[in-house]
């Protein structure tokens, strides 16, 4: 519950960053990163691959800035009003707190099966997506999501995304209609579901 204001700069490679509850700035290079702006618990299989990413200590969190490079990133801003920017790649992005589950894919990779919020508190997030496609649950608050390119699924408030066995989304639906905000959602140059 107590944390400082961190500046984290990570280079290329598959990075795992849990910034904690302070006002944090996180910048990563290319490759596949897992980034939580606030607190989280991560579960791995015996091969060292992630199987569950879960936001924790939900009452604590602050304003974070997250800039991720190219690659297939999984990012959660956390409780407060966060700014998230991604590069090229197929990204999973949550403006607030989130649960992401994954299953065994190839020998070196797991693929997502579920993405859903874990509480009803969130800030006014600004999410800028690069090319490549993304799956976004902006969450509570007045959020702004802008997609550059790539076939993306964007939910402005609460919702859940289920994925098929190949990692492509199978269905997406909105959540609690009482948890809403005045969101601005802008699609890119390809086919988006908003």
PLM-predicted stretches and their roles:
Residues 1-16, 29-70, 87-131, 135, ...:
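Acidic/polar low-complexity surface segments
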């Amino acid at each position: 519950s107590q944390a400082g204001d961190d500046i984290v700069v990570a280079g290329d490679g598959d990075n795992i960053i849990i910034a904690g509850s302070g006002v944090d700035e996180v910048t990563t290079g290319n490759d596949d990163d897992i980034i939580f702006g606030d607190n989280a618990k991560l579960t791995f299989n015996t091969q060292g691959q992630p199987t569950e990413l879960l936001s924790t200590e939900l009452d604590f969190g602050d304003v974070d800035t997250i800039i991720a490079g190219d690659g297939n990133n999984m990012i959660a801003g956390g409780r407060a009003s966060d700014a998230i920017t991604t590069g090229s790649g197929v990204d999973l992005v949550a403006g607030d707190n989130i649960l992401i589950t994954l299953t065994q894919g190839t020998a070196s990779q797991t693929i997502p099966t579920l993405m859903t919020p874990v509480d009803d508190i969130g800030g006014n997030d600004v999410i800028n997506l690069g090319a490549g496609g993304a799956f976004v649950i902006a969450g509570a608050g007045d959020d702004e999501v802008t997609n550059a390119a790539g076939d993306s699924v964007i939910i402005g408030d609460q919702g859940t995304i289920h994925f098929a066995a190949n990692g492509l989304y199978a269905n997406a639906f909105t959540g609690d209609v009482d948890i809403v905000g005045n969101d601005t959602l802008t699609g890119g140059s390809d086919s988006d579901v908003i």
